[in-house]
């Protein structure tokens, strides 16, 4: 199961125990109360700027944590264990620690991963990384198979930035999906529905955010926030906050730089053209045309700049997701998707349309009417102020300032209304949701910000009044926005929301005055509250951390007091530390001041600890119940893993438990209730006696002995290493109290309104661009400061550009042409410059000027490409490389497919050949039986011969499944292979000199020498080679010599010539046949083996064309006409079976052996007598060839004379003749 442990990154007070979460029905302390208790009530609601900045410098960094997941304080153990188990099973790459934040009373999962797991996650995410120069440079998606080509892949610290690590972990968490039918309490998941977003939308998970990395953050503070006159470190911003935020600051910096031109030009015109009306009219027309050209150039140049940055950051050609995940907030009815055939939520479009028509549209119109009425009210108030005589000049701007304040306040209300309407319209995809939200907010902001200006310019037609209103709105709104952006993250109430009310301002002023006062009041005495179960025990619940580092103004005076209080903890209940009278006097002075705040907050003294209360995690040990000694703090940390695991325990079964408060209240008080889950060791020891298995410490006991007893009784617990007494807050708990950074939506919205002020009505007020320039210089640093100090760190997002805001600002540029041309024509500038123009001519001139400006804008848009040339070339290179890689991949895939097809065809061919071989064996066995029956032989003997033949054909092989030689060996395409053997017959027959053998019952006869095989282990050639292809050296023609192989040719590779019986004294070893007819196998007999020779030997057992096709037997010259051999039919039985001679007839090839009918190892057959084969038994040379009668065919060569032998049973020695003639072969039809 999951590894869970209390973390080592946080610190806790020794000897102190945090409070348990309140029981049901008791209100939980707000999460925002942590900082109130850290810094005392004097800074209550004073502002998050001072608070968080001071606490930030004194927090303990959280190590080995990339993403923090927090839960509400009411979360039960079952929910935590269920989610923890799903994370560990579904995402085994993650390392999760479980902790409990003491002050916020929130559970938290500290999530991180190892470097190897992050590499696999980068491959899954498709994260683009820089490639080494020797491999082509540039960037490409990460691949684990080619990890060696990426830069810094060897370094764990330099390869991944913290933002990339967090993005990979977020990708894993968002892809943790539920199975069919899974449910958690009342939350029922669909199949493959993301679990984490759904639980966050339901409020079960409070927040999921990445943790700041203080080392990099401090460097950013120096190079970005504090370096006002330097360029922004955009690459560092991208590496830390992601592409989306870096793209916003790049756009803001580019916009601010471009604002220099209209600011300078407008300031010059405003300075030198205020002398007379004509100069002002000329400057108005010229500046309007200048703004049209400038806005167009700015937008087009930003496209090019944005393309360069997107290419540099690897997002220019990032492919969009093919299937976008539904929003977690999307609701509907369950149905089966017609596309994926899976269960999904469905919301009918007609319901959304009905809501838009009946709710959204009326509310939007009502808001516009409210804006119009507020504007009219402010104008009436201004008319009233102007009608009063004797008021100062500044009083004239009070109604305008009030209108600007109302516009700013209304903008926030309209934004919340737009978000509510968008949520109620229930959009399924995030892109559709964001698109409609932008439309609503832009519509509200446009009407709310520009309605008064349009009213003055188009209806009142008063340029002077328009200039004053524009200056008031622009300056006031920019000032309020900067103040709100900087202070709102630091001004908060219990719920953590930023409010800028009068009470917050008053509290901030009081806090600042208190800090600046010369006399700093001493701290009041802390007494244990009676409602906590009381007693002046040494429990940590009734004490307050005052040892410094908390940020309270009186911490220096309290530090010494705490040390004295520690020494006197076990004293009498009524005794107090020295200095008590002084504290009582100070308390009387501050009693009236703080009484109201005490009633408001309802604080409990036990929650004022500054130490971090860690959730304890224990493992139930399986097996023997022997007590294990407590591990050392160093042994609790596994090497390479930030998760703490107890040595010797099995991390398979674990539970969570609340830790008892140490000496907190009486045993019967509500705060002294036993924990919900008690942990017992395997030996049966419980923890119901005290917080750590021991007795509760008495009030008078020493704290050192208590801590020692805790260490001794903590063998089954996983506690963090004991550290020095530190009241500092952990970084993770502090960041969980910060306000969440919503998005760049609010920042773009402010810049959109400012851009409209500059380009729409700048002809009336040329200094608007200068005011915007000054504001933007402050805006960059204030936004940077807000991100680095006052807000949670956002997850990095990869975007290609600024998105829809580019189109919105382009539409604003087109609208600016129309508005400025109308102002020039209707406000009198054109009539004063050209008094001779009639009203109709003036209108035509304005229309012509408008069309000319639109044409100029279009030409600039077309003339300037959106992507620079060098970026386009690099993109073309990447596209070419991508296509080549795709082609290479296709070729490899096709090659693999062809190999698979070839292997499959070979397997099918092998199976067919094996089936054919088995069928042929079956048919040959049937023919043998039929022949045996026709010849009068015993069928059992024939079956034995058939089985012996099968054994001989498979001898030395791997089984009977090997195919035999195909019958097409002598086909025309194989003639060339066979002809290569013909010129080598002299070599084959040179060592094959033989002596004659006497036939059985006959005298001494001379036998021709057998043929010598090319392998040297056989003295005979195959029968089908002896007649048709082999020729004597005298009859060879020169044309046949050209077919001789240039190198030594081993016929044994093509035909197996080994394994036959040779006569003694010949080159091949052999043995004589025994008198009983069985062949003798001598020790010198050569057994040929090997896959090639054996396979070819089996192939030679197949019928040959001469056997099956012609049906004609061959005979030597001078023999009588042979009987015609009929194919595939048994020969007629002979009149009388003759006894088989012990030795083969001279010159007869048909004997048991590799070239005989039975094969090597076959059962001996009864051979015919010498009279049955007269040509073979004749001694001496045969007569000249003569034609045979009938249709019998023959081929013979004159055999050489053989020396006579005295012993007919003696095997003749090989003849030394260098080139004897081949032997004649006799095939009796009855033998085959």
Curated annotation (Swiss-Prot):
The modification N-acetylalanine is found at residue 2. Residues 2-244, 303-356, 422-437, 772-807, 863-1232 are extracellular. Residues 266-281, 378-400, 459-750, 829-841 are cytoplasmic. The modification Omega-N-methylarginine is found at residue 1020. Residues 14-23, 904-932, 1031-1043 have a biased composition (Basic and acidic residues). Residues 933-953, 997-1006 have a biased composition (Low complexity). The chain crosses the membrane at residues 245-265, 282-302, 357-377, 401-421, 438-458, 751-771, 808-828, 842-862. InterPro entries: Anoctamin (IPR007632), Anoctamin_TM (IPR049452). This is Anoctamin-8. Residues 1130-1145, 1197-1221 have a biased composition (Pro residues). Belongs to the anoctamin family.
């Amino acid at each position: 199961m999951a590894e869970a442990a209390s973390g080592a990154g946080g610190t806790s007070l020794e000897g102190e125990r945090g409070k348990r979460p309140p029981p049901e029905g008791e209100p939980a302390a707000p999460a925002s109360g942590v900082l109130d208790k850290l810094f005392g009530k004097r800074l209550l609601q004073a502002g998050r700027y001072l608070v968080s900045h001071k606490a930030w410098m004194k927090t303990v960094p959280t190590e080995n944590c990339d993403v923090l997941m927090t839960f509400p304080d009411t979360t039960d153990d079952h929910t935590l264990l269920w989610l923890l188990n799903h994370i560990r099973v579904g995402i085994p790459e993650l390392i999760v620690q479980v902790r409990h934040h003491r002050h916020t009373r929130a559970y938290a999962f500290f999530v991180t991963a190892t470097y190897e797991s992050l590499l696999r996650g980068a491959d899954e995410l498709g994260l683009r990384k820089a490639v080494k120069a020797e491999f082509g440079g540039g960037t490409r998606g990460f691949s684990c198979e080619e990890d060696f080509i990426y830069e810094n892949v060897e370094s764990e610290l330099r390869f991944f930035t913290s933002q990339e690590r967090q993005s990979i972990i977020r990708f894993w968490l968002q892809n943790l999906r539920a199975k069919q039918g899974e449910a958690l309490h009342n939350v029922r998941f669909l199949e493959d529905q993301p679990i984490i977003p759904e639980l966050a939308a339901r409020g079960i998970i409070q927040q999921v955010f990445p943790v700041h990395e203080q080392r990099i953050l401090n460097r950013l503070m120096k190079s970005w926030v504090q370096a006002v006159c330097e360029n922004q470190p955009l690459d560092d911003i991208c590496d830390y906050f992601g592409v989306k935020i870096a793209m916003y600051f790049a756009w803001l910096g580019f916009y601010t730089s471009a604002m220099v031109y209209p600011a300078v030009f407008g300031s010059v015109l405003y300075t030198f053209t205020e002398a007379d009306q004509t100069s002002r009219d000329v400057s108005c027309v010229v500046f309007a045309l200048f703004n049209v050209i400038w806005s167009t150039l700015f937008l087009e140049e930003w496209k090019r700049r944005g393309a360069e940055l997107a290419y540099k950051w690897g997002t220019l050609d990032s492919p969009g997701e093919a299937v976008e995940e539904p929003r977690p907030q999307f609701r509907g009815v369950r149905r089966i998707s017609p596309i994926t055939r899976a269960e999904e939520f469905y919301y009918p479009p007609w319901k959304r349309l009905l809501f838009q028509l009946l709710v959204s549209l009326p509310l939007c119109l009502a808001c516009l009417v409210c804006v119009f009425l507020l504007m009219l009210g402010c104008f009436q108030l201004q008319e009233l102020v102007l009608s009063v005589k004797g008021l100062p000049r500044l009083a004239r701007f009070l109604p305008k300032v009030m209108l600007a304040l109302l516009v700013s306040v209304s903008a926030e209300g309209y934004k919340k209304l737009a978000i509510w309407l968008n949520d109620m319209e229930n959009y399924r995809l995030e892109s559709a949701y964001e698109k409609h939200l932008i439309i609503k907010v832009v519509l509200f902001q446009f009407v709310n910000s520009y309605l008064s200006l349009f009213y003055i310019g188009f209806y009142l037609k008063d340029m002077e009044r328009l200039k004053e209103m524009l200056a008031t709105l622009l300056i006031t709104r920019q000032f309020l926005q900067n103040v709100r952006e900087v202070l709102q993250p630091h001004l908060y109430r219990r719920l953590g929301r930023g409010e800028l009310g009068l009470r917050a301002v008053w509290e901030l002023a009081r806090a600042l005055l208190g800090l600046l006062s010369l006399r700093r009041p001493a701290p009041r005495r802390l007494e244990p509250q009676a409602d906590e179960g009381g007693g002046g025990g040494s429990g940590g619940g009734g004490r307050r951390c005052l040892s410094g580092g908390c940020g309270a103004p009186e911490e220096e005076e309290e530090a010494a007091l705490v040390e004295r209080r520690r020494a006197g903890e076990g004293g009498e209940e009524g005794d107090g530390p020295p200095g008590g009278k002084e504290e009582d006097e100070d308390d009387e002075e501050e009693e009236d001041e703080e009484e109201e705040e005490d009633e408001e907050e309802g604080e409990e003294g036990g929650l004022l600890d500054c130490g971090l209360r860690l959730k304890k995690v224990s493992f139930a040990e399986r097996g023997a119940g022997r007590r294990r000694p407590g591990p050392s703090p160093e042994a609790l940390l596994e090497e390479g893993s930030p998760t703490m695991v107890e040595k010797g325990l099995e991390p398979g079964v674990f539970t969570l438990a609340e830790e008892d408060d140490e000496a907190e209240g009486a045993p019967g008080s509500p705060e002294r209730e036993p924990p919900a889950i008690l942990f017992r060791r395997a030996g049966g020891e419980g923890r119901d006696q005290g917080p750590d298995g021991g007795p509760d410490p008495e009030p008078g006991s020493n704290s050192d002995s208590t801590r020692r007893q805790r260490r001794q009784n903590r063998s089954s617990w996983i506690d963090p290493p004991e550290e020095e007494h530190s009241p500092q807050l952990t970084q993770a708990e502090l960041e969980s109290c910060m306000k969440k950074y919503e998005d760049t939506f609010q920042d773009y919205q402010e810049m959109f309104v400012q851009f409209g002020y500059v380009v729409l009505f700048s002809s009336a007020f040329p200094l608007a661009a200068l005011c915007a320039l000054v504001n933007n210089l402050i805006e960059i640093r204030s936004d940077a400061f807000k991100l680095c100090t006052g807000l949670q760190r956002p997850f990095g997002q990869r975007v290609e550009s600024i998105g829809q805001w580019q189109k919105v600002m382009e539409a604003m540029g087109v609208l600016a042409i129309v508005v400025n041309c109308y102002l020039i024509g209707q406000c009198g500038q054109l009539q004063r410059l050209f008094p001779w123009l009639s009203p109709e001519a003036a209108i035509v001139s304005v229309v012509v000027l408008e069309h000319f400006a639109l044409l100029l804008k279009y030409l600039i848009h077309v003339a300037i490409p959106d992507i620079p040339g060098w970026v386009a070339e690099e993109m073309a290179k990447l596209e070419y490389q991508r296509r080549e890689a795709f082609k290479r991949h296709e070729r490899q895939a096709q090659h693999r497919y062809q190999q698979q097809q070839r292997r499959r065809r070979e397997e099918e061919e092998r199976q067919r050949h094996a089936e054919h071989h088995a069928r042929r064996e079956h048919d040959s066995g049937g023919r043998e039986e039929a022949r045996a029956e026709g010849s009068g032989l015993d069928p059992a003997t024939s079956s034995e011969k058939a089985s012996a033949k099968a054994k001989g054909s498979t001898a030395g092989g791997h089984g009977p499944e090997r195919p035999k030689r195909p019958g097409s060996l002598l086909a025309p395409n194989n003639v060339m292979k066979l002809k290569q053997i013909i010129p080598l017959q002299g070599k084959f027959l040179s060592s094959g000199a033989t002596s004659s053998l006497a036939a059985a019952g006959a005298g001494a006869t001379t036998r021709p020498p057998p043929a010598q095989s090319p392998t040297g282990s056989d003295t005979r050639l195959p029968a089908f080679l002896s007649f048709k292809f082999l020729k004597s050296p005298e009859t060879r023609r020169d044309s046949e010599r050209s077919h001789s192989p240039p190198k030594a040719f081993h016929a044994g590779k093509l035909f197996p010539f080994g394994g036959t019986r040779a006569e003694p004294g010949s080159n091949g070893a052999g043995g004589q046949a025994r008198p009983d007819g069985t062949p003798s196998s001598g020790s010198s007999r050569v057994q040929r083996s090997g896959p090639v020779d054996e396979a070819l030997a089996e192939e030679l057992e197949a019928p040959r064309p001469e056997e099956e096709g012609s049906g004609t037997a061959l005979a030597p010259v001078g023999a009588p006409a042979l009987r015609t051999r009929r194919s595939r039919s048994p020969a007629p039985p002979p009149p009388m079976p003759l006894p088989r001679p012990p030795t083969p007839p001279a010159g007869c090839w048909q004997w048991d052996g590799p070239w005989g009918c039975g094969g090597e190892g076959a059962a001996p057959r009864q051979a015919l007598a010498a009279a049955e084969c007269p040509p073979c038994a004749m001694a001496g040379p045969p007569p000249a060839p003569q034609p045979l009668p009938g249709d019998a065919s023959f081929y013979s060569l004159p055999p050489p004379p053989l020396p006579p032998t005295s012993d007919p049973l003696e095997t003749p020695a090989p003849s030394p003749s260098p080139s004897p003639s081949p032997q004649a072969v006799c095939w009796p039809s009855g033998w085959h």
